[in-house]
């Protein structure tokens, strides 16, 4: 759950755009409505009844009466009336985190009154096209939005006894996705799903899942492996006030599932990103070497599923400046890193591989990483001005990456970004930072992926920077950068990773739980909601 400060942005709608489609009504004012169209499924499929939805947000205090009409493309059959009426608006409760274990959640109202319209539709054959949703009403200028239609081929209906076995895509690269373990029902330090629900396009293919469920973990392993991703870099948080004491940590359920509980754990790797910036890091070198590191060695590094490169466990230090501060300066930090290497060698490894986060382009932070004994540097994400176009975003990302590489101070692990958009947290939590919104759409994402691959292939053969790639981000549903399959983009981003970085044919069959007769996985979240109500 990282933080980034970006310029403020005005976000009209995440998915649909409002456009005048007829001459202005006598009111002659822009439509106040915000339209968010989405498919209920992350993977609509031919031969199956699917649902098209639109969430209509009404920022005014008026009780508007609307006619909402869906115009389908040829080949898509409507099973409900094309025009439906909206006259009732409501603001549902949102249960937002206080980031405080003793007083974890507070009840707030949704930002805008809203209503959702749903149509059942069907296509007999695979189909691509565009549907249009129009909204009109007395005193409201007509508004329209569109939604891509992409029905995958029909599958024979089956009920699988478990998550279907992954068919891993072959790749020569070590591809990892950064991973936030914040989606366990009722986790007091995390936002949870409630603030995300007003953004229905962000709903994952797995639904509002409970991350505590190992079956959810196995779906994530399947999705990752089948698109060339072979490890997750998982955020790891020490408990507040725990520095200097035997280790206690929070949100460790995902690491436990991947290493110990998932059925497919032997096929996948994980490593930890030490989030030492907002909760406790270490009190001093003694705490690092006698509390924290031994805990990691025994509980994580010695597990077969923990990522090692050249027999060195991989660890990310998110806030290197805090690490230096807590150890009493750069020289002390370097000495401690040397002792971490010695301890890992004594435990049977070849040392430890430490990577530190830095997303800027100035040389001084990279030089500090060198002086502290870091093995490499990477960017968690990229800070992009919200007013740049998607094409400019490609150039800005690559300019940032190339400047850090050309500095030549230490290996730079490339990061392939999705974007940024923490609007759910800004709207519904005590989010302390500013926010912007930018998105690398699939076409731009493909361009960046191809350029990063070219850059990696130009690096010394066998070097870390030629082998390792990080994706930003797997599941930051609240921060607004997420490559995992969801309603908004399906498998589009993962398929691009497979196309660019994997061997063999790009053709493959993606599955969602309903294809296998599995799920839903939201029982934990729904049960928790009842306790809040």
Q: For each predicted feature, which ranges?
A:
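Buried hydrophobic-core signal for structured, non-transmembrane domains
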Residues: 52-56, 119, 131-134
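Short tyrosine-centred short linear motifs in exposed loops/low-complexity segments
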Residues: 47, 62-64, 125-129
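Glycan-processing catalytic domains of CAZymes
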Residues: 71, 90-101, 107-114, 123-129, ...
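Bacterial N-terminal signal peptides
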Residues: 7-17
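Short acidic, flexible loop segments centered on an aromatic residue
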Residues: 61-77, 82-88, 136
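Short beta-strand elements of extracellular/lumenal beta-sandwich folds
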Residues: 46-62
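Low-complexity, acidic Ser/Thr/Pro/Gly-rich terminal tails and inter-domain linkers that flank the onset
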Residues: 24-46
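Positively charged n-region of N-terminal signal peptides that target proteins for export
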Residues: 1-4
């Amino acid at each position: 759950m990282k933080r980034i400060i970006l310029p403020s942005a005005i976000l009209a709608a995440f998915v649909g755009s409002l456009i005048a489609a007829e001459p202005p009504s006598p009111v002659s004012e822009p439509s106040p409505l915000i339209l968010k169209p989405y498919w209920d499924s992350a993977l609509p499929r031919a031969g199956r009844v699917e649902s098209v939805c639109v969430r209509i947000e009404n920022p005014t205090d008026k009780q508007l009466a609307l006619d909402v009409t869906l115009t389908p493309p040829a080949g898509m059959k409507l099973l409900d009336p094309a025009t439906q009426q909206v006259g009732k608006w409501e603001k549902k409760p949102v249960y937002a985190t206080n980031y405080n274990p003793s007083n974890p959640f507070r009840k707030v109202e949704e930002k805008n009154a809203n209503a959702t319209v749903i149509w059942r539709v069907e296509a007999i054959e695979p189909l691509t096209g565009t549907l249009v949703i129009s909204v009109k009403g007395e005193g409201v200028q007509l508004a329209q939005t569109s939604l891509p239609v992409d029905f995958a081929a029909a599958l024979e209906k089956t009920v699988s006894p478990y998550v279907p076995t992954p068919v891993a895509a072959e790749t020569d690269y070590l591809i990892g996705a950064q991973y936030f373990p914040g989606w366990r029902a009722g986790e007091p330090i995390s936002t949870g799903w409630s603030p995300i629900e007003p953004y229905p396009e962000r709903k994952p293919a797995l639904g509002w899942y409970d991350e505590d469920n190992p079956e959810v973990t196995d779906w994530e392993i399947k999705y990752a492996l089948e698109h060339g991703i072979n490890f997750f870099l998982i955020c790891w948080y020490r408990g507040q006030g725990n520095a200097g004491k035997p280790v206690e940590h929070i949100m460790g359920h995902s690491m436990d599932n991947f290493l110990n509980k998932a059925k497919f754990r032997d096929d996948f790797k994980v490593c930890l990103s030490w989030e030492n910036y907002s909760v406790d890091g270490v009190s001093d070198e003694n705490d690092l070497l006698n509390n924290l590191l031994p805990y990691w060695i025994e509980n994580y590094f010695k597990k077969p599923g923990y990522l090692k490169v050249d027999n060195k466990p991989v660890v990310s230090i998110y806030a290197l400046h805090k690490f230096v501060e807590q150890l009493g300066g750069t020289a002390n930090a370097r000495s401690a890193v040397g002792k971490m290497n010695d301890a890992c060698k004594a435990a049977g490894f070849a040392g430890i591989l430490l990577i530190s986060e830095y997303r800027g382009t100035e040389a001084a932070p990279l030089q500090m990483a060198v002086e502290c004994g870091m093995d490499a540097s990477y960017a968690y994400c990229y800070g992009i001005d919200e007013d740049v176009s998607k094409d400019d975003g490609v150039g800005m990302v690559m300019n940032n990456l190339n400047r850090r590489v050309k500095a030549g101070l230490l290996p730079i692990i490339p990061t392939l970004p999705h974007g940024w958009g923490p609007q759910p947290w800004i709207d519904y939590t005590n989010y302390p930072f500013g926010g912007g919104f930018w998105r690398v759409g699939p076409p731009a994402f493909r361009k960046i992926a191809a350029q990063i691959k070219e850059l990696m292939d130009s690096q010394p053969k066998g070097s870390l920077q030629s082998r390792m790639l990080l994706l930003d981000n797997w599941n930051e549903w609240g921060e607004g950068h997420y490559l995992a399959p969801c309603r908004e983009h399906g498998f589009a981003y993962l398929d691009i990773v497979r196309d660019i970085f994997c061997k063999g044919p790009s053709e493959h069959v993606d599955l969602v739980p309903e294809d296998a007769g599995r799920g839903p996985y939201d029982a934990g979240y729904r049960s928790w909601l009842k306790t809040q109500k």
